[in-house]
Amino acid sequence: MKLLKKSSSLKKGVTKRAKLQKKPPSKDEASSSDEELAKLDGEGSLDGNESEEDDGTVQVEKGGMKKHKLDLEALKKSDPEFFKFLQQEDADLLNMEEDEDDDEEGEDNEDEEDEEEEEESDEDDDEEDDDKTKIKKIRKPKVKSDSSGRLIVDSNVYSYLQQVLVLDDETTTPINPSDVRMAIDVFVACVARVGADIEAPKYVINEQSIFEAVVRMCFQAMPDVLKRLLKARPDGEKVLFSKTMIKKYQTYVRTYLHAMIVFLNEVQTTEVIIATLKAITRLVDLYAHFSRMSKLLIKAIVKIWSRKTLECRLPAFVCMNLLVKNYPQHFVPLYKTAYVAFVANSKVVTNETWPLLQFMHRTFAEITMINPEQAYKYAFVYIRQTAVHLRNAMIAKGRKDLIFSIYNWQMMQCMYMWVRVIAKAHSVNGAEQIGELVYPLIQVIVGIFKLCNAPTFLPLRLHCCQMLIQLQASCTNYIPIMQLSCDCLEELARELKSKPKPAKGAVKLPDIECTLKCSTQYSDLPQWRKTISEHVFRTMMQSAHLLASQAAFPDVALPINHRIATILDTMKNADQAHLFRGFQTKLKEHSRFVLDVLARKHVDLNDEMQVRAVRFDLNNPDSPIKSFYRQWEKVWKMKEKSALENSKKDDKKKKKEEEAAKKRKATETLEDDDDEDAKPTIPKAKRKRIKIGAAAKRADATVPDQFADMSLANWSDED
């Protein structure tokens, strides 16, 4: 009964406490309510060891748990029915032990969870610290300014830019646009230091080491930085950029791209030009997005491709090829600019410039094959333009200016280049249209050959024969080169009729490959006649070697033999006559060889297999013409090697002489300076004044003034 009273009092206390909590107490009632709550807590405790929380749950302290258990056991023994009633109605009074155990376990679990959360929070703090160290903002250095107000780039600025821009992890590291802008402004200062005519930049660089370090850093880091800033993504060989980012940062990008082009135009050192071109090649995808920048880039790289050394021209061609290959819209302006630049820079041909011109021939042919459909339109127009010049010169033969508009290196180099382009087109699929231009090109070259028959232009006619040989070898078209070479032989025979005039002393002859016209001072020399006859013989051998495997060789060689025989009858020089007679005998032997092969086999022209079998038999390496050609080819190679060695020796001698002359001048200037310094200063002696008499003062009117021509009116620097 006592327990029932206690439980009922507990319930009454809980309800009363809830009511007191719902009503907000006033200031007067606050102290009384606290006392009542304290009394309620005291009334509901079991022997001072039990308390009740705000939610009505009972908490029993550990000290009164044993006594509570003993009371429950005594109640169970004394009144089992009431104990069952308590189990059904108020089981919380009986389950105090289990609740306490659960509370203890819960406290233990909460302690463990708190420990785990503390450990995890510590780990998270460590990770955050690591991230902060990774994405740690670097303080911008304080930049000093000079007297004009421009900011000075020193080692602190360079180290800051290097830490910000040169980053290993590209994905996680963000890029600050202000840092990119600062780097671009610093590079513009480098461009101004080179000597470019631009506005005064924001920054200025005074140290050469800082200048070189900044340029190197921009070349290495800026392409990747701009790609990350513009959110670039690869698309095959091209790189695509975000349109929104390009619109947002186009002023930055255009400034840097223009600065790179200005820097490329200003520098002159080969190593710096190559490094700049490599950096620009990494930015080609970015240049292609801006039409004005792409035009400036085309002008700059074509200028290097046509004017600089071979080491510089190669990376320029790589940049040109990449721009045209990935972005066809820039093909036409680049193609036009390259052709005009080639024509403008082919006026002078020497042994040093020939490799550069040949490089331009090959690279222009490669660019043509990238887009042959568009290139055909302009190739047709350019070849037609040369034909128009030739027609004007043929109509007015008496005008030397029109003849020399054809007989110059620009026209001949254009012919060489189109020969290379058409020869390349016959080996590339899809370039059939350009391959068809071989017919008008042959007509133009033959017209140039027949324009003027003067013996002084014999080297030019040999150049025309060499171009026709290249076309016939690559295009498999028959060209009457042997007849044209016989025309050269006739001119040579006319020149050999006159007696040679030996030179006085050692004379250096011009290289036939680098000359179009032979002057009269060389034409009468025996050394020149020997070299020109060897070149004529070589062209005749090459033209015969091209036809050696053709069944029509006897028919072509028959009139050639008669012409050579008549020409040799008039030739007085025994050495040259012996050279061409050997060629004539080989023509006869090879024509017999071809007739014997054709006589042994029955050939049906409609059967391709039989025709191929005959060509295979005629293409015998032991045939008379081919074996004879191999022997002479070895001789020609040996002569070319010796000529190259001699030219190298001459160049070395010239360099040594120039260096010695410079040293002499330097020593002479030093000696003159020393002599001037060593001259003693002699004090001038005071002159005694001589008294002039009255008779001496009177001037003689009969004596003329000897210094009249040195008056102020007639005196000038030119005199």
From Swiss-Prot:
Q: Kindly list the places in or outside the cell where this protein is found, as annotated in its UniProt entry.
A: Nucleus
Which regions are flagged for Basic and acidic residues bias? 25-42, 643-661
Pfam families tied to this protein: Noc2 (PF03715)
Q: Where is the composition biased (Acidic residues)?
A: 89-130
Q: What is one Gene Ontology biological process annotated in the Swiss-Prot or TrEMBL record? A: gonadal mesoderm development
Gene Ontology molecular function, alphabetical: histone binding; transcription corepressor activity
Keywords of the record, alphabetical order, are: Developmental protein, Differentiation, Gonadal differentiation, Nucleus
Instruction: Spell out the Basic residues composition-biased ranges.
Output: 1-24
For this record, an example GO cellular component is: Noc1p-Noc2p complex
Query: Region Disordered: which residues?
Result: 1-67, 86-136, 643-719
What family is this?
Answer: Belongs to the NOC2 family.
Its function, per the record, reads: Required for normal somatic gonad development and for regulation of germline development and proliferation.
**Protein's UniProt name:** Nucleolar complex protein 2 homolog
Native organism: Caenorhabditis briggsae
State the gene name recorded for this protein: pro-2
